[in-house]
Amino acid sequence: MQRFFVEPHQIDEAAHQIHIIGTDVNHISNVLRMKQGEEVWISDGGQKEYRCAIEAFSADEVLLHIIYAQEPDYELPSRIYLFQGLPKADKMELIIQKAVELGAYEIIPVETKRCVVKLDGKKAAKKVERWQQIAESAAKQSKRMLIPNVHQVLSFKEALKYAESMDIRLIPYELAKGMQETKEILAAIEQGQSIGIFIGPEGGFEEKEVEAAISEGAKPITLGKRILRTETAGLAILSGLMFQLEN
C-alpha cells in the first residue's frame, strides 16, 4: 500500500478527512493512476499514521477519508545522525537511500580535506534538494514515520560544531583499538541517546581531522579487518546500531 506524508494542518480528524496537496496530487492522480476507493497510508511526520480511502479528486487536491488511526513503533528509540564525507559520482544517493531505510534521523553531507567533490552555492542547494527527494522516497518505501532531513553541506569544522550536543559521537578509524573495545563502546549506547556517526570520503579522513574529532569527544572505532568503501562504512554502523537499539 502506498504511503504519503502530510503536515498536521492537512488532517481533519473531526471530519475524518485528510487533504493531500502539492506534488503528491499529480503522483496519485497521473503517475499511480489511483482510483476512488483505493486505500493509502498517511503519516503525520510524528507518531500517528492513518489508513485512508480516496474519497474525491480535484485539480489541486486529493481528499481522503480516514478509516482508522494508529501509533506504530517504527522509529528507532535513538536519533542517529550520519555525517557523510562527500563521495564521488552518485554514491551519495545510494548512501541516503539506505541510511533512511536503516533508521537514520538526519544525513549531513560534509566536505573534508580529501573530498574530490566540492559543492557550493546553487550547485550545493540543487544537490541537497535532489537528496531530500531521495530521502522522502526511501521514507515512503520503508514505512518511516518521518522524512529524515538532508542537511545543507557543512565543512568538517562546522560538522564537529553541529555534533557538539550529541550524546555519542563515533568515528571509524584504521588506527582505532581492537574490535573488543568497539563492541564495548557500542554496547554502552542506551536507547534515547543521540548518536553522531562520522564517515570519511574515498581515502578516509586526514589524521588531523580524526584528532580534531577525538579532541571534541568522538570515540574512534574499528569496522573490522576489511577495508570498507565510503558507501558501505556508514551503513555497516547503522545496521549494527539498528539491531542493538530496535525495540
Model-derived regions: residue spans:
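N-terminal positively charged helical leader segments and presequences
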Residues: M1-E71
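RNA substrate-binding interface of SAM-dependent RNA methyltransferases
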Residues: D73-I171
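Active-site/ligand-binding-proximal alpha/beta "capping" segment
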Residues: M166-G204, E209, A218-I221
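Structured adenosyl-cofactor binding patch, chiefly the S-adenosyl-L-methionine
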Residues: E207-N247
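Short, ordered loop/turn segments at secondary-structure junctions
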Residues: H9, A69, E111-R114, K225-R226
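Mobile, glycine- and charge-enriched loop segments
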Residues: V40, H65, E71-F83, L186-Q193
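Short, hinge-like loop/turn segments at secondary-structure boundaries
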Residues: A124-V128, A188, S239-G240
